[in-house]
């Protein structure tokens, strides 16, 4: 019996100092201590804010000022800050300022975009740093905001240690690091670049997320950090990841050295496996993965880095597509259920050291009036499915301001349903979240604090870790969750069945790549054109105890169907392929999965398993399961094994019914039907 007692999720607002200030109030000085951003008294701090860009186009598409008019730019943007902080009353604690290349590029010189530095003029940057960016930073601080300044423009598609863009960043930050108006201001921080995509790895290949690329990325930014420190700049520095600021696992192995280092993250719908109504331009994405898919991606990329340093989300927003007023297109949704925003907050709060912001235009934030809407009459400002309505109240919660009273609190599991079920199917190698969720009558969720006590009957199958149940093995386990909120004690017991390949909605994804279809009732699925359907395992699936992985379809096909396995959590990496050809069965030898380059796949951590086809044809999936006997699958047969043999028992949907039982007792009490016992098909007839 595994028994664990801990506080549920360590909700950020109740465990950290908020560093919330108002105009004229002295702001705490911050520094990095271990994985935390802390104030002078050692209180943990998470910042929450918004962004502002200083160019005519981003200031309401050129309708407010132009022609390098410094005074009009300052007047407009200061008024926007007044609107956000004073008139609308956002409880924000930081602002991300873009030192837009509008000011530093030579006027009239054509560029291909913000990633083109060919028109950069250092003298113009120096001039407008003093005339525009420093005055705006000082004004924001006077409003009670910490300031994060980012360099002009965005990274080109490919960067490399020692290339022109690297030299450009060194030049920009080398100058900034000598400006005492900034370096002697404890409320100013710097984000070293915007959205690196690919970097030339130490192996000479461009990419992102590989060990060679991770090592090169650290070297790239370490050299910039070292230059700034040599100039006497001790400000907090926020380092971006690659993949448009979505990849951070590499920093856990190759961290940036020095003090006052954190990592700047971007989070948009569709990223990290989150739900997107419309795929993001940068990383795509789809809708339907809900909490579990998002949590798996978050665990892979954010949590390893958050274990060593603070994280700050410097771009994120979401609204339903119909409003056309956000970068990200999704909904707030439900914590532990479908949607983006609520699940993001749950994950950020659970991680504990993640600050975040809304990248929605500040001119919109300034128009927010706090008036609730009604069904059928919502606007982008008060729709509970948008980031402004929920974000405004979540910021107030973080800052400790009074909110409507809690109407109800209950325990929920993912995938979320109306109540906690007594029986729960969980995919081996995946996770199920658990949270205490409150309703304040505002149309969206709040996660709350409460004592949680967890007891698990079989920790080899199921493991509890900081609000998450991890399915470690194939089998069954009972989990009893007891909790106390405001003196109310509740206890719920759930029987979990962990199986790797449930042919069920919410587990089998027909659209891992391209839009496919799936009918749970019949088991029929189709892929999109050159698409992929199957299962993803965020924590990795361990099949090292088995010799084979077998997939069966109802009838032969003629559409290029193949069975594929990935041991890297990236669909665009090489995978092992087994063709169906004219057979109804594809059998993968788990001990001998070799790629064309000779690399052997590791069955102890498999992340994506499923089916590729040309698209346009339906296939009826019978079963997918691991086994130790390849030949036994040729047909239904009797089994003759010694009494002391130990076997596992599966139904034909791949659900493990019994694990590690004596062979002579494996079939005892089973209803009539077809089973997999010890890797062989067995027909039970009583």
Residue spans for each PLM region:
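Extracellular ligand-binding interfaces
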Residues: 525-599, 613-627
